[in-house]
Amino acid sequence: LIITDPAHLTGAMMKNKTEPGKHEIYYFRQDSAASFLCEADIDALDLSDILAVHFTGIFPSISDSAAAAARQLVKRAHENEITVVFDPNLRCQLWDNSPETIALLNEFAQSADVFLPSLKEAETLCGLTNPEEIADYYISRGTRKVVVKLGKQGAFYKSAVECGTAPTFAADEVVDTAGAGDGFAAGLISGICEEIPLG
């Protein structure tokens, strides 16, 4: 689905590499076209051939109407037996880590079929630092599968039927980690759609 909005600009992100291993990122999302998405836009979606829906915490953070749209997306996905994957993707430029913010992101985490936090994000959201305890926390609240990203240590995964740690892919030199989480999510979702076990 592509919706055009002649009244608002497309959101953008610019990244400035200041020195090896470091960068500055600038976001231009306020009053973007995406921030005006609403429940009616979600209701117009044809979900008949969709296997999975993936979104991050950025989507509901950009406006109240986007948060409502995200809720409607989750609702419609569940009604159509579509797997919902949620990555909190915490961004200090968007979130203040207030109790209201944490409650909102936990709402989406607990309504997702698959939750993909980093260890640091999970600690912010639930106060736990042990990957298995984090997984148990969300599974006990309705999430079916939890995958905790552990950086160089790989990823911990748990569901009702499997549990373990997957190693990272070895690289001789890491130039930039931007987009690594998105790439990880894409691979994971592809595997889920193909019904490949997490382990």
Labelled PLM ranges:
Residues 1-57:
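Conserved N-terminal subdomain of the carbohydrate kinase-like
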Residues 75-79, 127-199:
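Conserved phosphate-binding/catalytic region of the ribokinase-like
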Residues 18-21, 101-105, 135, 162-166:
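Short, hinge-like loop/turn segments at secondary-structure boundaries
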Residues 52, 58-137, 153-155:
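Conserved beta-alpha-beta core of the PfkB/ribokinase-like small-molecule kinase fold
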Residues 7, 31, 90-92, 151-153, ...:
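Glycine-rich beta-alpha junction loops
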Residues 12-14, 38-42, 101-103, 132-135, ...:
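A generic local structural motif
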Residues 12-13, 23-26, 83-84, 114, ...:
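Structural motif
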Residues 45-48, 110, 141:
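Structured loop/turn residues at beta-strand edges in well-structured enzyme cores
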